[in-house]
Amino acid sequence: MSSRGKWSWLHSPITGGILLIIAATTALFWANLAPSLYHHAWHDALFSVSSGFSATIYSISLHQIVNEFLMAIFFFFIGLEMKRELLDDDLSTLKKAALPLFSALGGVVLPASIYYFFNAGTDTVNGWGIPMATDIAFALGVLAMVGSRVPLSLKIFLSALAIGDDLMAVLVIAIFYTEQIFVNELLVGFLGLIVLAVANKMGVRNRLVYYSIGLIIVWISFLASGVHATIAGVAVAFTIPSRREISMGNYLITAKGLLSGLDKERHNKADVLTKNAISSLREIRDLSYQASNPLQLKEEALHPISALFIVPLFALGNAGVIVDDSMLAELTNPIVLGIAAGLIIGKPLGIFLFAKLLTLLKLGQLPEGVTWRHIIGTGFLAGMGFTMSLFISDLAFSEPEQKIVAKVAVLLASIISGIVGYLILISAPVIKKDNKLNS
């Protein structure tokens, strides 16, 4: 078995989904069995900076490190996914991209409107962005559990829909959940982005250039500007090169020549290679890098870090809410009603209605093998807001009580949406290539 095959489970959406469930469950047990320990572990300052004998001028907690630094890396990964999807054949033209992106718009507008309906005129109306989010890791994980009963084109549709959803969520965070903007710091951040864009245009592929400028200049500047630092992650991702240095045809021609030169090493059983062999192998390695897409290489490298470390750690630090008898009374809270109805009803209904409208207008069509039942089931999976919804709830509310109520609503709605979506898809008739239905 190749090393790639041996570790392929690290890239499975099921693995990420299982870890996310374990982390969220652990957070709930931890917060309810040892609430004081949970709070101190995540919110006490890990270190602080003081000026002489004056009070602390800066401190940072584990919760802040996760939400402001590690989540910026997660959003960088999301940005890489967005750019790759937009360049991919499945979304490379307006006609192909229209259905999932327009459906994503419906899955944003209707949930936000439902939340606004329940909370209009109150101090909780600012949470309208919470039910518009989709947790792509959870959604794809559940879809993977359905297996071959759904066509591959549905996974592509869900991925594209989630990318559109994430793009709108990022814009909402940048525009509506930024309280105060310091222009000078923001301009420095934009200057860093311009430098990276120029480097991309000039063909610079050195990852150190993009990581150092992205972290030292862009991320710190955005953090200081008042714009949430996660936006810097997405912005930097769009400056990452996506062009190969050599074509696959030229790669194959050159690689075959180098491999033929290694033919004389066929019978060399010694562990020590000849200088010729070392040189040829090094050239093949460099050639393989030149034939690769830098954007895809970074995305592949970050996927396990994001799915298996950052997102579960975020869930561990943000999903811990104390569940007691008082929570039952909160089930009629406008925050709970708005989030739950938005995710459970608004998401699938908005996605279905906007997709239906586009097909009726002949501006788009369902992917091959996908039925309207699949679209509805996928809509429910998109209602699993979890990570993104928890993240936005932390930005939307300043009162701890409101944050707790919102988190409970997100957890309940995500579980219900996931179960309903799974049941709809697992019970859907299988459509074979001859278009005959099979139960």
Swiss-Prot record:
For biological process, the GO terms are: regulation of pH
What topology does the record note for this protein and the membrane? Multi-pass membrane protein
**Superkingdom per UniProt:** Bacteria
Instruction: Spell out the Pfam families in the cross-references.
Output: Na_H_antiport_1 (PF06965)
Question: Where does it localize?
Answer: Cell inner membrane
**Keyword Ion transport appears in the UniProt entry:** yes
Q: Which reaction(s) does the protein catalyse, per the Swiss-Prot or TrEMBL entry?
A: Na(+)(in) + 2 H(+)(out) = Na(+)(out) + 2 H(+)(in)
Any GO molecular function: sodium:proton antiporter activity
| This protein's GO CC annotations | plasma membrane
Family membership: Belongs to the NhaA Na(+)/H(+) (TC 2.A.33) antiporter family.
Listed name of the protein:
Na(+)/H(+) antiporter NhaA 1
Q: Which gene encodes it?
A: nhaA1
